[in-house]
């Protein structure tokens, strides 16, 4: 272990920079209220294999399934340029690039979001490099520029980012957020582009090469992402460290998923991505269908799995065992309620592309609201502790 072990994490917590995150209405909720969810789920099924196995086809193209952002619920504010222009972005550990809408974008998705005007920034430098992020539902295309990015008190100079010129995706039009700030490994970014976190570290702006998330369960406020240190007041007990199994995504090995001592999924071990850009618990279709049956969730005409809201008081915890440590997810976490419609639904979602022989999961915000999470790039590991 490097010099900044657990004690280092605590003693250097005063050096960290904390960015507030605000809980927002998810795209799923917006689609459900507009009676568009069924059509969307049928037309754009999520493909987890794309997220796990993608390799860049060329220097300017990256594949990111927009389905991943259907349930995103937290965003924070950054600014771009001099003087600063503000944007609401998703801090996403499941992708690596930063992009925001630009004034050159004429798509409907750009007309109702903040757009960056490079002509009003004295520090903007155009690169001429095209960029295309291909989603499960469409694409975001544009070009790469360089400018000053401000994240709370951090001033990230000469940062490469994407400026959208075309956003034909209907989901981006309905999104509350303006853009995405990726926090995954550089190997996932568009070739030649240094991600924000790496640029911050290279400029000596961080005391430790790590960041952490606390996602509050107490309403819209209280959630934070912190850079360069860890604030122990956000968790109880000790951090348990899990090695990253594949430094592309924040991917780890998981031992099993069980209820009352009986393994119900991930039997014999599997892989899991810890992903702040996903809200639900995603896994192989067969395994998830088995879990839906166990918790008595019923498939609706929209394709979602609904459940009796009173079941939250009777259903058991579901235990995710990671590196020998059990992380229980209680019913009040894996059952979510749409307050506007007064209905409850399962937080598990299946993916038809994955067979049980190559079982992979994504642990999204349902899991992360329960467990404070540290993403340690120096040691390629993830730290988990019970969130306060």
UniProtKB/Swiss-Prot annotation:
GO terms for cellular component: extracellular region. Its EC number is 3.4.23.-. Keywords: Aspartyl protease, Disulfide bond, Glycoprotein, Hydrolase, Protease, Secreted, Signal, Zymogen. The keyword Hydrolase applies. InterPro entries: Aspartic_peptidase_A1, Aspartic_peptidase_AS, Aspartic_peptidase_N, PEPTIDASE_A1, Peptidase_aspartic_dom_sf. It is found in: Secreted, Extracellular space. Its main location: secreted. It is an enzyme of class 3 (hydrolase). Residues 74-385 form the Peptidase A1 domain. Residues 1-15 form the signal peptide. The keyword Hydrolase applies. This is Pregnancy-associated glycoprotein. The gene is PAG.
